[in-house]
């Protein structure tokens, strides 16, 4: 086998396997990172596909079958990555339109694109660049129960009094910590926001509503200490991913929360419906996750299931809400985000729903990817419009 063909197969076969996951049911958890990488980094995979085709293009009468294998892999890579890439421009335009309409409906001027205005190919290649951000790690936020809660504080490089964003991590309420999304947090700080990312007690040792109480500990710390750190305690947003988004929404729904804006990425919506119909595929074993978090089954704890469901806290106005869901999310389907948006708006809450068609659950684990950059752009724009003065 000649060297060119060998390299083409070494590149083409595993890349084809990775990208094939993007169009398959996610039966096992290991498939999710592959699906995220395959879509978020699609332009890089497209280049790989073109290289594979270029290497295998030269005719080789001795290795004809292997040559066709390599060309087939290259074609699959180009097609599978291209299906994501072609949807980027209309998705970006639709997201901008949804943001502008949502902000205007809320009575806020649509802020101009800020630090992250467009999709940046260099960022896609080398990652987010935030060299001048100072992070205070392991700050004591307070005690909840018998557990000392800690947080990381990301300081903007600019002088002045900055809006504050409380970041709540995901992880199915049983894993994860405040370091989640640290590159995204640094990017928000670089855009002029003081970011506080806090821990909370985890299931199954601690059941709901312990986690909600822990978020309140972080909120009290922010109100007490933000001014001394260059933050404005009168301009607080709360943001979470997945499990953290559920906690963010419930925190904002509390009476006199003092929160000015809330952002949820792929938030759980209705634990009752999720228990009754976990859906398929179910790589997380949703009922086991709910049992671990809530402390029992729906039959045993029906009121707790309802109380933990954001859908049941939509009947009165909340602060302006930004929801971001992936159209390819097989853990928390887009239809739940659409239902939550409808109910929030019906209850008088100004709500912006951004849909990213190719995005999987936790797509922003690659914050410099296609969906990650789009989400960062929209989050910055939303926070700027709501919080900046």
PLM region descriptions:
Residues 103-118, 249-303:
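Hydrolase active-site cap/lid region
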Residues 223-238:
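Gly/Ser-rich "nucleophile elbow"/oxyanion-hole loop immediately N-terminal to the catalytic nucleophile
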């Amino acid at each position: 086998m000649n060297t060119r063909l060998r390299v083409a197969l070494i590149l083409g076969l595993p890349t084809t396997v990775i990208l094939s996951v993007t169009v398959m049911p996610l039966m096992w958890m290991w498939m999710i990172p592959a699906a995220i990488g395959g879509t978020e980094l699609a332009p890089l995979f497209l280049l790989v596909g073109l290289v594979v085709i270029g290497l295998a293009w030269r005719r080789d009468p001795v290795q004809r079958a292997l040559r066709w294998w390599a060309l087939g892999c290259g074609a699959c890579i180009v097609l599978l990555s291209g299906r994501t890439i072609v949807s980027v421009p209309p998705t970006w335009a639709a997201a901008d339109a949804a943001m502008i309409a949502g902000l205007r409906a809320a009575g806020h001027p649509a802020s101009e694109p800020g630090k992250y205005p467009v999709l940046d190919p260099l960022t896609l290649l080398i990652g987010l660049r935030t060299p001048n951000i100072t992070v205070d790690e392991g700050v004591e936020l307070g005690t909840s129960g018998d557990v000392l809660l800690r947080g990381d504080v990301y300081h903007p490089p600019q002088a002045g009094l900055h809006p504050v964003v409380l970041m709540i991590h995901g992880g199915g309420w049983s894993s994860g910590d405040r370091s989640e999304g640290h590159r995204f947090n640094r990017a928000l700080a670089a855009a002029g926001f003081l970011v506080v990312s806090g821990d909370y007690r985890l299931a199954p040792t601690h059941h709901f509503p312990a986690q909600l109480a822990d978020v309140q500990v972080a909120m009290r710390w922010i109100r007490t200490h933000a001014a001394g750190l260059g933050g404005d305690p009168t301009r607080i947003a709360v943001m979470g991913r997945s499990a953290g988004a559920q906690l963010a929404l419930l925190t904002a729904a509390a009476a006199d929360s003092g929160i000015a804006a809330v952002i949820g990425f792929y938030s759980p919506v209705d634990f009752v419906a999720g228990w009754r119909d976990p859906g398929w595929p179910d790589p997380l074993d949703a009922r086991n996750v709910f049992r671990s978090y809530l402390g029992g089954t729906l039959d045993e704890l029906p009121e707790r299931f309802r109380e933990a469901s954001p859908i049941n806290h939509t009947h009165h106005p909340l602060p302006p809400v930004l929801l971001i869901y992936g159209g390819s999310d097989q853990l928390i389907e887009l239809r739940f985000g659409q239902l939550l948006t409808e109910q929030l708006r019906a209850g008088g809450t100004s709500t912006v729903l951004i849909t990213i068609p190719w995005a999987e659950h936790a797509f922003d684990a690659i914050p410099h990817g296609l969906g990650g950059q789009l989400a960062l752009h929209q989050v910055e724009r939303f926070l700027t419009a709501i919080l900046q003065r």
